[in-house]
A protein has these predicted regions:
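Beta-alpha-beta core module
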Residues: 2-16, 30, 76-124
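Generic preference for hydrophobic
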Residues: 8, 19-20, 43, 68, ...
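Thr-Gly-centered strand-to-loop micro-motif
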Residues: 22, 45-46, 91-92
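Short loop segments at secondary-structure junctions
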Residues: 22-26, 123-125
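Extended ligand-binding regions for polar small-molecule ligands
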Residues: 36, 120-142
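Secondary-structure junction motif
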Residues: 41-63, 127-131, 135
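Short beta-strand-to-loop elements that line the ligand-binding cleft
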Residues: 45, 64-74
Length: 142
């Protein structure tokens, strides 16, 4: 990302990276997922994870060596397929709301992989009044 084109505010929170899976998946019995646990399980991987080296660094090998069944931009579609029993997905913890009655669960990676969170917008952006007020409120409260 060319950050010269954007303004941003670092948010005072991080998100944790892990695997979204069904509760009846054998890996769901683990508290945390280690690279050697992945084996040949079918996984969904976000496009962004293919471009960066965070996931391959955690794995200790190329992401392409995974049994990757598909890539995605938004976790909602893979979440629906995972719910039906088709694989697992590498994702951030807070991207998917998992109700108590859901058959899905999230397990964090170990060693821990965290991401800083940012609010980002184009430089010189013309905002609507509500958007301007929102941004001012965020800036004052962070």
């Amino acid at each position: 990302v060319d950050m010269q084109k954007y303004d941003y505010i670092k948010l005072p929170a991080n998100d944790i990276f892990g695997l979204l899976m069904r509760k009846d998946c054998p890996l769901a019995q683990l508290e945390k997922i280690h690279p050697e646990d992945i084996g040949d399980y079918p996984v969904f991987v976000a496009h962004q994870q293919l471009e960066g080296n965070v996931l391959s660094g955690w794995l200790g090998r190329d992401v392409q060596s995974l049994n990757m069944i598909a890539t995605f931009n938004l976790i909602t579609n893979p979440a629906l397929m995972i719910e039906k029993g088709l694989g697992m997905a590498f994702t951030f913890d807070n991207l998917v709301r998992i109700p108590e009655e859901s058959n899905l669960c999230f397990r964090p990676l170990e060693p821990k992989v965290e991401a800083e969170l940012y609010l980002v917008w184009k430089k010189f952006q013309m905002f609507t009044k509500p958007a301007e007020l929102f941004l001012e409120t965020v800036q004052k409260n962070i």
